Amino acid sequence: MNYPLISEYVQSIRFSEENFDKLSNLCPVLDEDGNPVMFSGNFAIVFKMQDKQTGKLHAVKCFLREQEGREESYKLIASELEYVSSTFLTPIQYLEKEIFVDTTQGEDTEFPVLLMDWVEGLTLDKYIRNNIHDPYKLALITYQFCRMGSWLLSQEFAHGDLKPDNIIVREDGQLVLVDYDGMFVPAMRGQKARELGSVDYRHPLRREDVFNGNIDDFSIASIALSLKVISLKPELFDEFGEGDRLLLCAKDYIDLKHSLALNSIQKMIDDTELLQLLGLFYLAYSKNELSKVSYHLLKLKKPEYLSVIATVSTSLAVLQYCQGSTGIG
């Protein structure tokens, strides 16, 4: 099947009431210029839609190219998530021949869409950048991620492409995973992965035939370690962070001994929780997976606002004293 151009989808979405089959109650949310709010990627474009009756916001994903096994995979994922009750995930629904598009790309005019809840918030990397000078928020988001990571390790399914760009931080600080294209569910056992995930967050030995409930394990360990380090020493984010990369990248995974980021991290092992997460990272790296009991290594103490501020204030006071005593500054 040949899929429509982005411009053709936009035109169809403008008149969604006429062009949707079952979703005719949805209308596009428009930006300041009167255009539908949308986000595009390599394989799909996502529109922000609103239910005219309830006011609820939804995300409608329209596809730009063919992917083998996509329909079957989405149906299996939707079936699995139907019985999962968690704030970390949002339900999805795959609808065949849902949107009519007058396209020049082929003879087909009806195309599938994926319906999801719209998740309002910032991607994890943007949240870190916006709060890089707020030690409490950095500590709290590290704690929240480790809670989510611990929960994921206990599940039989896996997200498949765990990275900051696919983790949304709501206004209340809660985390939500989005983009389930690479998800593994037990019903897929024996299949090959449809995608391998971001190179900066996947294990260097991950291949398409490695497709099981453990494919998130290394990503969880890497992100958890990076967040903890940033919460303790934010300047390392400025030094090593780039794009949606927090600290570590594919180059580090290939040669740990010569990783500048890991070398900086190892100088901070006087912190008990950081040492704990560093051990988890090395364990995930050596085995390309973590056992179900490893989740306890992600259990961090919930940060208290006054405690974090007091620690930072003390550190600043010591620094100022040292500068005064040595004539620095």
Language-model features: where?
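Juxta-kinase regulatory segment immediately upstream of eukaryotic protein kinase catalytic domains
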Residues: M1-V37
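ATP-binding glycine-rich loop module of kinase domains
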Residues: P36, I45-T90
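Conserved structural core of kinase catalytic domains
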Residues: P91-H133
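Catalytic-loop of the protein kinase fold
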Residues: L153-P164, V169
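Activation of the activation-loop gatekeeper triad in protein kinase-fold domains
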Residues: D179-M183
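Conserved activation segment of eukaryotic-like protein kinases, specifically the C-terminal portion
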Residues: Q191-L205
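Helical subdomain adjoining the active site within ATP-dependent kinase catalytic cores
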Residues: V229-L319
